[in-house]
Regions:
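S-adenosylmethionine
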Residues: 1-440
Length: 440
């Protein structure tokens, strides 16, 4: 099969449907087919457009497939999705999308399906979604927001008026969020440097020290990135790390640190002094932290492979601790569209809640009296956020909720158990944080 961007996208989509881990699968397929430049960008655009709109694409295709999509061979299913995505969302002419899809059936040795692909796409590409009649609000949300049933039901229950927008809202204005390294520059100066290099739509974000920019390629391709002038990190994530209020000379723990963005911000706040222990449970993810720290030139960071649910004698008592715990990820559904189709299994959710609670208890033991603990997630699930903090305070009366010095952006929902960012209200990722003080 000759290498081409459409074939690469379809091959990656077949693997993604089987195995998940969308970004890793796409990267591997692009390397395997040796795509570069525009071809690489086009393949990536097809892949992520299908993931982002899969619910809508599938609904439309099902109107013209009496036996349904599930009965088709996986390559044929993904060829249909990819072609419809191009015609509907990527401004590719219908004739080109259809003709190239028919060619792909031969490339994937599915020539017997070429007639079906041609006939279905010529009708599907002109389908008017405004004429659709949905069975109920859940189906409407699954189709218009491109979500699985479990996620659609969660959003309909908890955020009924914002559900579709939460699924599709582009956090940080659809731009890449950066953190200026204050040891080398500041946000205003970084904006000027990026603009001088031809980067478009550069502006400061709402979180102090953040910068938003639109890059033609990867932000990691910039010389300023390689020189440690900035790292890539969402504004909501930056806000959580700022609430730790790390100071020079302190001992600070980042318990669930990979891939390392918050560690870098904490090291910056500490002015590369004191000791920052940056930990993660997987060694390959710890290596990501090491790579980022080395690029930025920090010498006050010690990396450690560590299970944060257990007390590790290698970790000292700390002045400040950040616990950015594993979570359901329901706050970043637009950024990671494959999460929209996850099963919200009650048993797995109970395990996740227990893991979060165990990490909080570990942090409580490691924190010095008078110290600051910040708990954060990238979910908008109340059980993992406000209710988790309420339960922690019941177990640990030596803690109280603290008010961070950093001002929260407009739209944050602040309660007695922490602060919540909902994308449609703040313009940032869905995120939760709570600053806690150990009083004795």
């Amino acid at each position: 099969m000759a290498a081409n961007p459409r074939a690469a996208a379809v091959a990656a989509l077949v693997r993604q449907e089987q195995d998940g881990f969308s970004n890793l699968i796409l990267d591997a397929e692009l390397k395997r087919q040796k795509l570069e430049g525009r071809d690489k960008a086009f393949a990536s655009a097809i892949f992520y457009t299908v993931l982002e709109h899969r619910g809508t694409l599938d609904y439309i295709l099902e109107q013209f497939l009496p036996k349904g999509l599930a009965k088709l061979d996986a390559p044929v299913r993904e060829i249909l999705r990819a072609a419809l995505a191009q015609a509907r969302y990527m401004q590719v002419p219908v004739s080109a999308a259809v003709n190239e899809a028919v060619k792909l059936t031969r490339s994937f040795k599915k020539s017997s399906a070429s007639g079906l692909v041609n006939a279905v796409l010529r009708r599907a590409c002109t389908y008017d979604l405004d004429t659709a009649v949905f069975r109920d609000d859940i189906e409407r949300l699954m189709v218009l927001g491109s979500a699985g049933r479990d996620v659609a039901e969660f959003l309909h229950k908890n955020y009924p008026d914002e559900a579709v927008d939460i699924l599709t809202y582009k956090a940080d204005g659809g731009l890449t969020s950066l953190r200026a390294n204050p040891l080398k520059t500041d946000a205003a100066a970084l904006c000027e440097k990026l603009t001088a290099l031809g980067v478009r739509e550069v502006r400061q974000g709402v979180v102090p020290g953040s910068v938003l920019a639109r890059f033609e390629g990867s932000p990691a391709d910039q010389e300023l990135f390689r020189q440690g002038y900035y790292h890539v990190e969402g504004q909501a994530s930056q806000l959580a790390a700022l609430c730790v209020e790390a100071k020079p000379g302190e001992t600070v723990l980042d318990l669930c640190a990979a891939p390392g963005g918050k560690t870098l911000l904490l090291a910056e706040e500490m002015q590369n002094s004191g000791t920052l222990y940056s930990c993660d449970a997987a060694e390959n993810r710890v290596q990501l932290i090491r790579t980022a720290v080395e690029r930025m030139g920090f010498t006050n960071v010690k990396t450690l492979c560590n299970d944060a649910t257990q007390t590790n004698p290698a970790l000292p008592q700390a002045d400040r601790i950040l616990a950015d715990v594993p979570c359901s990820g329901l706050g970043i559904l637009a950024k990671k569209p494959d999460l929209r189709y996850k099963k919200l299994d009650p048993a797995r959710q109970a395990e996740l809640l227990a893991t979060q609670a165990a990490i909080l208890d570990t942090a409580a033991r490691l924190l010095k009296a008078g110290g600051r603990l910040v708990y954060s997630t990238c979910t908008i699930e109340p059980e993992e956020n406000q209710l988790q903090i309420r339960a922690f305070l019941q177990r640990h009366p030596e803690f109280c909720v603290a008010e961070p010095a950093v001002a929260f952006p407009a739209g944050m929902t602040v309660t007695e158990y922490g602060a919540l960012s909902v994308p449609t209200r703040t313009g940032m990722d869905g995120f939760f944080l709570c600053a806690l003080q150990k009083t004795r």
